[in-house]
């Protein structure tokens, strides 16, 4: 069995790359639902899994100025995998171990020979750590090495969504496609679509009492100031209200997963699941 696990990729038998994706020797699309009859008829031979890192701490310190409240005490440095993220990723690995043992792709407590299993991760602390926790759950008695191209923390080009080509015509085409997401109003339409999220973010953060309002003159998230920058050899990035809202949205959602009490996670506000979905929109669409 020649396996390459690449938090990354398992080529030949199993692949682990980013969001969960299963590939069998047949087309699952032909089967409307997961059924016992299907499993009796087909044998899993290969699997490809694409996965991002698990829960991390927020990326920057801007969030401290957006609310008068204290954020949770993060268990890791900014942008690094949190303790909760490690726990959850171990559980994820255990789930895959049970599934793969059940389907006969690996043995219980398998110890693959050297070189038969490879874990390849992006060279960020959060991704290397995610791969390590996942491997401990999936292969708990195996001495697995985690491969990465650079010393932490540097982005591996394999995983970087940076432009490798740019000219005026291409830039205009990309901007046109982005603006189309806002309908006939273009970028303003994107901003308008986030209006409810912006207001809920302001309310949850109690942003009117924050440092950014008191010292910076910030008056709230605007729906009409979206700016997008496209440059060669860089990832696309946004400016102004959406940039700040993405940071706030990201931090609140991470706090929701890190803090067991959802009311505490929302700084004393009793939010519904639908509210949390609304809060997550800026980071999901940004």
Predicted feature locations:
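Bacterial N-terminal signal peptides that target proteins for export
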Residues: 4-16
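Signature for phosphate-centric chemistry
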Residues: 29-116, 122-286
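Bacterial N-terminal signal peptides
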Residues: 15-24
